[in-house]
Amino acid sequence: MKAQLCILLIALVLFQTFSQSDAILSAIWSGIKSLFGRRGLNDLDDLDELFDGEISQADVDFLNELMR
């Protein structure tokens, strides 16, 4: 029973880490961008198009409403 509880807690921590990794990486990336300035990294802003484009603005608004 103790082993199952430990495995469950470790899995929860790993899932939480995975779900928050995007926020951490975006914060690090914005810090790097501010260090080098906007002019040096203007062309790298095109990487935003790599994300899934099927999420509409209405979906984003709905998710923002849920997070309030």
Swiss-Prot record:
The keyword DNA-binding does not apply. It is found in: Secreted; Target cell membrane. Residues 38-68 form a propeptide. Disulfide bonds: none annotated. One of its GO terms (biological process) is killing of cells of another organism. Residues 1-23 form the signal peptide. Belongs to the non-disulfide-bridged peptide (NDBP) superfamily. Short antimicrobial peptide (group 4) family. This is Amphipathic peptide OcyC1. It comes from Opisthacanthus cayaporum (South American scorpion). The lineage of its organism: Eukaryota, Metazoa, Ecdysozoa, Arthropoda, Chelicerata.
